[in-house]
Amino acid sequence: MPFELKRPDRNHLLHHFKTIPGNPPVEWKISNNLIEYPEALHYMQEHVENIFAQNAPEQVWLLEHPSLYTAGTSAKKKDLLAPHLFPVYEAGRGGEFTYHGPGQRIAYIMLDLKRRRQDIRAFIGALEEWIIQTLAKFNIKGERREDRVGVWVKRPNYPFTQSGFSPEDKIAAIGIRVRKWVSFHGVSINVNPNLAHYSGIVPCGITEHGVTSFLDLGFSVTMHDIDIALKQAFEQIFGPTIDVS
């Protein structure tokens, strides 16, 4: 029988993406006002080019958007169920349709993977691990799924799906793009958004499972609480940060 080399799943990939010694810490930027999506996209594209040219440091940008939908490169038109409910933007990231809005913490991640690890699959695993460790600080058990990117929470008190799957909901989505080995776009974590706003799309093209949030799970936390936990978990995986305005 010929030897078959199996591709390792994301659970078994190393999750440490700390930069090579001597590089500056990652800028940690928080915006407290709602940021329009085109403004954020323009900022990311410009910052990514500056990182590649070694004219800007790596950065994580935490923010919230007004209510909107974004379409990734794999989005299907049929999954946009209510095209006039909120503005719809072509994101250019991987993935399908998702919702962004108040009460959701967005983390845009602009890292130079050449300084870290040039492995996109492992990078996505590291982002999932970052979220899982963040959730654990609030005693929420987040899990990854090999066939679905993102972080999921089991719902044992819910009925099984129509296909007989165990019930679980997505609490965090991941959609990234890598240009010249510099990442942008990032992750979104549902803290206390209006989950009804997801009804205008098929989130990430997945019909068998729903979405949840900290509040939906019974956890009343502030965005500041989330930001502290995100920073602590980020530094464990990606290395030191420095606050910027």
Swiss-Prot record:
Recite the UniProt keywords alphabetically: Acyltransferase, Cytoplasm, Transferase
Compartments where located: Cytoplasm
Q: Would you say which domain of life the source belongs to?
A: Bacteria
> BPL/LPL catalytic domain: which residues?
54-242
Site residues (Lowers pKa of active site Cys), renumbered to this chain: 170
Kindly report, in one word, the top-level EC class recorded for this enzyme.
transferase
Q: Molecular function terms in GO for this entry?
A: lipoyl(octanoyl) transferase activity
Q: Name its GO BP terms in alphabetical order.
A: protein modification process
One GO CC term, this protein: cytoplasm
Please name the PROSITE patterns in this protein's record.
Answer: BPL_LPL_CATALYTIC (PS51733), LIPB (PS01313)
Q: Which EC number(s) does UniProt give?
A: 2.3.1.181
Q: Active site annotated at which positions?
A: 204
Q: What InterPro entries would the database entry show?
A: aa-tRNA-synth_II/BPL/LPL, BPL_LPL_catalytic, Octanoyltransferase, Octanoyltransferase_CS
Chain positions recorded as substrate binding sites: 93-100, 173-175, 186-188
* Short name of one Pfam family: LplA-B_cat
What the entry lists under CDD domains is as follows:
LipB
Give the reaction(s) catalysed.
Answer: octanoyl-[ACP] + L-lysyl-[protein] = N(6)-octanoyl-L-lysyl-[protein] + holo-[ACP] + H(+)
Pathway given in the UniProt record: Protein modification; protein lipoylation via endogenous pathway; protein N(6)-(lipoyl)lysine from octanoyl-[acyl-carrier-protein]: step 1/2
Return the similarity comment: Belongs to the LipB family.
Any extra remark in the record? In the reaction, the free carboxyl group of octanoic acid is attached via an amide linkage to the epsilon-amino group of a specific lysine residue of lipoyl domains of lipoate-dependent enzymes.
Q: What does this protein do?
A: Catalyzes the transfer of endogenously produced octanoic acid from octanoyl-acyl-carrier-protein onto the lipoyl domains of lipoate-dependent enzymes. Lipoyl-ACP can also act as a substrate although octanoyl-ACP is likely to be the physiological substrate.
Name used for this protein in its record: Octanoyltransferase
Organism equals Bartonella quintana (strain Toulouse)
